[in-house]
Regions:
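Metal/cofactor-centered catalytic core regions of large enzymes
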Residues: 63, 193-570
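Terminal low-complexity/charged segments
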Residues: 1-250, 411-425, 491, 500-533
Length: 570
């Protein structure tokens, strides 16, 4: 019998995490911990803690065994955690408990073949210069998330092939997500007062011409042509800089510079109350605001253990599937513009259909893009009478429109030649890169979180998951087109089975009481006052919860310390 490591006891006070003695893991009654049992048997005292936490399999691993652990988790026949979906880090310096290490790295592993998820936490021993081995040579998809954790949290990943900042500019003076960096802690380099002396010569000065040697990203060949595309370029559909290496007309390499639109959502979220971050989640991707709301509130509701009324569940599914269609329509229009298959015509057509969806959104909440409609405990308001009538008309018209788009594009020789055989990714490549959503399904991986790890009531719906095997741009196009049809199928079932009842929970500690109740109930007034002043108190614990968004897996990792604000929000 193995004995637990003495160091395990340093982690006994982590919020919500119960330390499990190694022999006890095997005796857990549910088969969901069979994976943690096998891991503990393999690594013994190097597993600091293991078991279920908020329903999720969680293990704590010593950093010196992390590489070996990751390779074992990926290749072992009984585990087969072939994908890494997320990497982040936690700065625990402001937690009021325990004497453990300041920094921890957090990994989310996924087994598509076994429909299992595993959260891996690695405490880092050096508080001043935290470092941990990079997993990029095991999971290709770790490269960018590790760069982000280094950039924003200051954790160095030894052995990383290209460890540099990814969001903040090089030379930024701090790592913003560390707890000792305040919100707005950076110095603003410009004055806002035109009378200040620094503006006296504005527009009149001539700077001396100086020769600046070009700085190339790692791996670029100076013998080829290097072109800067963006950050302001119509083909990037946003503020994005691409350093493109060309050999003649062939693109050899692209190095993306992503940070121009970095808005600090995580730092902001850690300084906002749980209920207030719903409005920020819209802005993470305004083309998928409903889905952003949905993923966030599901995570918090699972931490709270709150039950959602059946009517609210069905309304959420209707709205998020409408949002999926709207997002796919916008993708289709911009994709056609870039490929120039039929010029601007398809963009105008899909905009017409997308406007009908936005009209439906406006009917329920008054907003079209940043809707903030899905709230903690339910939805903002019930469906108005005219909503279902207009939705029924849309459900009749939309399948015909999708067929029209396919005829316009699929029968176009130009469309075919510019998509078929282009951007081919094999099944193994998309899994190891950590790609999700239509990218994953376009390369032959039959996986959809709505079906394979159902949430929010999706287990009650009958729909197909479209999969293609070619792995090229055309395959991903066909997957998204069929996904719109399947979303219509889900919405039709939801409308048919829409129950009566409340549209939000009656737990007054989670959702505000209705206005009429405030006039007659002092208790309702007290609940309203406490929710608006103190906020919603989430019990200590942590959770990673993911949904199938329009662009792929959208996961939220929340570390709660018992207050009204998330200690860590990722």
């Amino acid at each position: 019998m193995l004995n637990p490591s003495p160091r395990v006891r340093e982690y006994e006070n982590i919020p919500g995490v119960v330390r499990l003695d190694i022999p006890a893991v095997a005796s857990l009654p549910t088969g969901e911990t069979a994976d943690t049992t096998r891991i503990v048997e393999r690594f013994g005292e190097d597993i600091l803690a293991a078991g279920l936490h908020n329903g999720a399999q969680t293990v704590y691993v010593k950093p010196e065994r992390l590489l070996e652990f990751a390779e074992f988790a990926r290749t072992d026949e009984k585990l087969r955690y072939e994908a890494l979906t997320d990497v982040t880090a936690i700065d625990r310096s402001e937690l009021p408990i325990g004497n453990g290490e300041r920094f921890q790295t957090v990994y989310q592993l996924r087994s598509y073949s076994r429909k299992q998820h595993l959260t891996v936490i690695c405490p880092l021993p050096n508080d001043d210069e935290p470092a941990v081995p990079s997993l990029a040579n095991i999971y290709k998809g770790a490269e960018w998330p590790e760069r982000e954790a280094y950039d924003l949290m200051g954790v160095r990943f030894t052995g990383h092939p290209d460890l540099r900042r990814i969001m903040m500019p090089e030379g930024w003076p701090n790592h913003p997500l560390q707890k000792n960096v305040p919100v707005g802690g950076e110095e603003v380099p410009f004055s806002m007062t035109w009378s200040d002396p620094e503006f006296a010569s504005l527009g009149t000065q001539i700077l001396p011409a100086t020769s600046v040697p070009p700085t190339l990203p790692p791996g670029m060949n100076r013998e080829n042509m290097i072109i800067n595309m963006g950050p302001h370029h119509p083909s990037t559909h946003g503020v994005l800089r691409l350093v493109v290496e060309l050999d003649g007309e062939t693109v050899v390499k692209i190095d993306p510079d992503l940070g121009y639109l970095h808005s600090g959502f995580e730092k902001t979220g850690e300084n906002k109350r749980y209920k207030d971050f719903v409005y920020y989640s819209d802005r993470m991707d305004y083309l998928s605001a409903m889905l952003n709301n949905f993923g966030y509130v599901l995570t918090i509701e699972k931490l709270l253990g709150v039950d959602i009324p059946p009517r609210a569940q069905v309304i959420r599914i209707i709205m998020t599937e409408l949002q999926r269609i709207a997002s796919h329509l916008f993708w289709l229009g911009t994709h056609v513009m870039d490929v120039s298959g039929t010029g601007m015509s398809v963009m105008m057509y899909v905009t017409r259909e997308r406007e009908r969806i936005l009209d439906l959104f406006e009917m329920v909440c008054g907003a079209r893009l940043t809707v903030s409609y899905i709230r903690l405990g339910g939805v903002y308001r019930d469906l108005p009478d005219a909503f279902l009538t207009n939705l029924a008309d849309f459900l009749v018209a939309m399948p015909v429109r999708i067929d029209e788009y396919e005829r316009m594009l699929t029968e176009s020789p130009l469309w075919d030649v510019r998509l078929q055989g282009i951007g081919v990714l094999s099944r193994d490549e998309v899994i190891n890169m950590g790609l999700t959503g239509p990218m994953l399904r376009g390369s032959g991986v039959d996986w959809d979180l709505r079906r394979d790890m159902p949430y929010g009531g999706f287990e009650n719906y009958d729909f197909k998951v479209p999969v293609a095997t070619e792995g090229d741009c055309f395959a991903r196009y066909t997957v998204r087109m069929e996904e719109m049809r399947q979303s219509l199928r889900i919405i039709s079932q939801a409308v048919k089975n829409l129950p009566d009842g409340p549209f939000k929970t009656e737990d007054r500690k989670v959702a505000l009481p209705p206005r009429a109740e405030l006039d007659v109930s002092m208790e309702a007034l007290i609940h309203h006052f406490k929710l608006m002043t103190e906020g919603l108190l989430v019990p200590p614990g942590m959770l990673y919860h993911a949904i199938e968004s329009s662009k792929g897996e959208l996961g939220y990792f929340v570390y709660a310390d018992g207050s009204a604000k998330p200690y860590r929000l990722h």
